[in-house]
Structures are given as C-alpha cells and as structure tokens.
Regions:
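Conserved N-terminal phosphate-binding loop of PLP-dependent enzymes in the Aspartate aminotransferase
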Residues: 1-188
Length: 188
C-alpha cells in the first residue's frame, strides 16, 4: 500500500517480484476517493518503465461515472480491467478485460468471467449493454450526477458541522462525515 500521489515511495517498494500495480479508479470502500487523472498517468509511466502490469479495478464504478470506464477521461490504457456490478444490473456477473499483451498468457480455462457460462447472466449482461449504448446514456448519467451533487452540497451546506465533503463522479457519490458514521447507521 502507498498514499496516492507518493510516486517516489511507490517506485522504491516495487521489486523484481512485483507483477502489477492494481488500483480502484474510484475507491468505493475507501470513501469514494477519486484517483486523479495525473496520478493514473504517472502509474502508467511507472508500470511501463518497470515492465509491470497496470490493473485498473472498475468493479464498482464502470458505467456509473458518465463514461464507460472511470479511467477513460485520463487517457490511460490499463493492461487489465476487472468489471462487475454495473455490467449485471444487479444480477451476479463479472468479467476480466485484458489487452493483447496480457491475452497471450491466457490459455483455455483461464478465469475471465464470473457466471460467464450462465445463459441468464449473459442475457442480463447483453440487456444492460443495450441500455448503456443507447444514445445519451452517459450524458444522462452526468446530468443526473450533477443534480445529485448539487443536492448533496445543499445538505452539506445546511449541516457543516456534520458533513465535511461531497465526493464522487457521475452517480457514484459519498459524503465525508465529521462525526462517527456509526451514529447514522444505528438510526437506519
């Protein structure tokens, strides 16, 4: 583990046994922390220089940010992209997308999909992709995300001693609280 942006430390902890750097483009469980584009670009440079893979985990954020993948706006091309959640529209489905360099090492039987042989999962995935590829889908995600962001900012402004920050991109949003989250969870 390393603090994002501390690329000098990262370079020092990479050894000859390091195969890849893997990061969530938006850290979901880590507090909806968006990895800045400059950071993703630097990670790509480091991986290229060290001849290791860059894995950008899109399990939680793919299709939900206003673009197909959250990393797209950075211009970075990862070697491996795990996806799930959004691709199944709530139905269990996941996949592992790889570039040509990585695909050479994948032989028959290599794990590339969760529920991939399940006809229902594949039908659901196809239906989700049909919706995602509809005209203006991503524009609508951005528009609704802005509306959501504005609403959350109003709540933050109303409760400045409780809410520190509104985070997120598109429809992935989170609030950084100034009070213990357990208080709110208990009241649910």
């Amino acid at each position: 583990h390393f603090k994002f942006g501390d690329h000098n430390k990262l370079k020092k902890i990479i050894t000859s046994k390091t195969a890849a750097i893997m990061v969530e483009t938006i850290m979901g469980e880590g507090g909806i922390k968006v990895i800045p584009n400059w950071c993703l670009k630097e990670l790509r440079k480091i991986c290229d220089k060290k001849k290791i893979l860059l894995i950008l985990d899109e399990v939680q954020c793919a299709y939900r940010t206003g673009s197909f993948f959250a990393f797209e706006k950075s211009g970075v091309n990862p070697d491996i992209v795990p996806i799930a959640k959004g691709i199944g529209g709530g139905f269990p489905l996941g996949a592992c997308l790889v570039n040509k360099k990585v695909s050479i090492g994948m032989t028959p039987g290599t794990h590339g999909s969760t529920f991939g042989g399940n006809p229902l999962a594949m039908a659901v995935g196809n239906a989700v992709l049909d919706i995602i590829f509809e005209k203006d889908f991503f524009k609508n995600v951005e528009k609704k995300g802005e509306y959501f962001q504005d609403g959350l900012k109003k709540i933050k402004d109303k409760y400045p001693k409780i809410i520190e920050e509104v985070r997120g991109v598109g429809l992935i949003k989170g609030l950084k609280m100034l009070v213990d989250n357990d208080e709110f969870i208990k009241k649910l």
